[in-house]
C-alpha cells in the first residue's frame, strides 16, 4: 500500500514583510524570521516553498535582496524528496501516450509547498532522459491520497485529443474501493447528488457494485460518470460506508492509507482510433482481495 500522505494539514504557512527601510537577502530573511539555519533556508527555496505573495511566483535565489514585498512560506511538516519515476511505474507507452502509476500521497502536480515532489516532475525528467521534447502535462487527475493510472501525452495534438475524450466522458474509468463496513442490503448503487466545492454546486453520478469480501474488507467496483472533487469518497460516505483509511470523510487516522485505486481505463487511441484498455492491479491490492485477476476476477458479486 502507499506510503505517508502529505496534506495541507501538515503544512505551516508564514508571511514575512520587512520593516520600512530594511533590506536583506532572501536567505537571511528566512533565517531571521523563521529561525532556520542557512541550510534549512536553502532547502525551502530549492523545493519551491517560498513565494512572492503579491506576484504569486516562487522565489529561488537566496541571494536576492528583499525590501518591502510580502513573502509567503508554505513549509511542510514532513520531509520532501525530489520525485522520480521508479522502475515499473510506466504501465503503458507508445509514440503518442504515456500512462504511469501514481502512489498514494504523491501529488499529480505542484502544490503550494513544493514543485519538486510530484508526479509531473518525474514524468518531465523521464521525457528529458528519453529525448522527448515536450512539456508534460497531466491529462487526468487523482486525489492526493488515491492511487492509480495517470495519462500524459507526448505532443500537443494527442494531448488535445485525449483531453477531449475525458471532457466528453468517452473514457471509461474503473476504480476499486474498500470499506470496513457494508450492510449488504443491496449489491449495486446508482448515486446521484449535487456536490459543493469552493462555492460551486455540480451534479455528480457514480455507479457502485459490490465485488467481494476478504479478511474483513469489503471491495467494490466503482464507475464514476462525472469527475467532481472527492466524488467517490463523498458518495461512499453518504450512501455506502466511508472508505477505509479516509481521513477527511471517514475515521482514518492521520497518515492512513486510502483504499481507493483507479485501476483501469478504456479509451480510443488518439492515433489509431482503436479501442484501448490499460489496467493495473498492484500486488498489495491483489493480495488483500484474495489474488483475483484484473479481468475475470473483478466481476461484481452475483
Model-derived features: positions:
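RNA pseudouridine synthases
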Residues: 2-302
Amino acid at each position: 500500500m502507499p506510503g505517508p500522505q502529505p496534506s495541507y494539514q501538515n503544512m505551516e504557512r508564514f508571511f514575512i514583510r520587512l520593516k520600512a527601510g530594511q533590506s536583506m537577502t532572501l536567505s537571511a530573511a528566512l533565517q531571521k524570521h523563521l529561525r532556520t539555519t542557512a541550510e534549512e533556508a536553502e532547502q525551502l527555496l530549492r523545493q519551491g516553498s517560498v513565494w512572492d505573495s503579491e506576484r504569486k511566483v516562487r522565489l529561488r535565489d537566496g541571494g536576492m535582496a528583499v525590501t518591502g514585498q510580502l513573502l509567503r512560506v508554505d513549509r511542510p511538516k514532513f520531509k520532501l524528496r525530489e520525485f522520480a519515476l521508479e522502475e515499473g511505474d510506466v504501465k503503458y507507452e507508445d509514440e503518442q501516450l504515456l500512462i504511469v502509476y501514481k502512489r498514494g500521497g504523491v501529488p499529480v502536480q505542484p502544490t503550494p509547498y513544493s514543485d519538486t515532489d510530484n508526479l509531473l516532475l518525474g514524468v518531465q525528467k523521464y521525457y528529458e532522459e528519453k529525448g522527448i521534447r515536450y512539456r508534460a502535462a497531466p491529462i487526468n487527475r487523482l486525489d492526493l491520497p488515491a492511487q492509480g493510472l495517470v495519462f500524459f501525452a507526448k505532443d500537443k495534438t494527442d494531448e488535445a485529443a485525449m483531453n477531449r475524450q475525458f471532457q466528453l466522458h468517452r473514457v471509461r474509468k474503473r476504480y476499486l474501493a474498500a470499506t470496513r463496513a457494508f450492510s449488504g442490503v443491496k449489491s449495486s448503487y446508482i448515486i446521484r447528488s449535487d456536490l459543493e466545492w469552493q462555492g460551486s454546486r455540480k451534479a455528480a453520478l457514480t455507479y457502485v457494485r459490490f465485488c467481494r469480501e476478504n479478511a474483513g474488507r469489503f471491495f467494490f467496483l466503482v464507475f464514476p460518470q462525472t469527475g467532481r472533487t472527492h466524488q467517490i469518497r463523498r458518495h461512499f460516505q453518504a450512501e455506502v460506508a466511508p472508505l477505509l483509511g479516509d481521513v477527511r470523510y471517514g475515521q482514518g487516522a492521520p497518515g492512513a492509507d486510502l483504499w481507493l485505486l483507479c485501476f483501469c481505463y478504456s479509451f480510443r487511441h488518439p492515433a489509431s482510433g482503436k479501442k484501448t484498455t490499460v489496467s493495473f492491479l498492484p500486488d498489495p491490492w491483489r493480495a488483500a482481495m484474495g489474488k483475483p485477476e484484473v479481468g475475470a476476477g473483478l466481476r461484481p458479486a452475483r
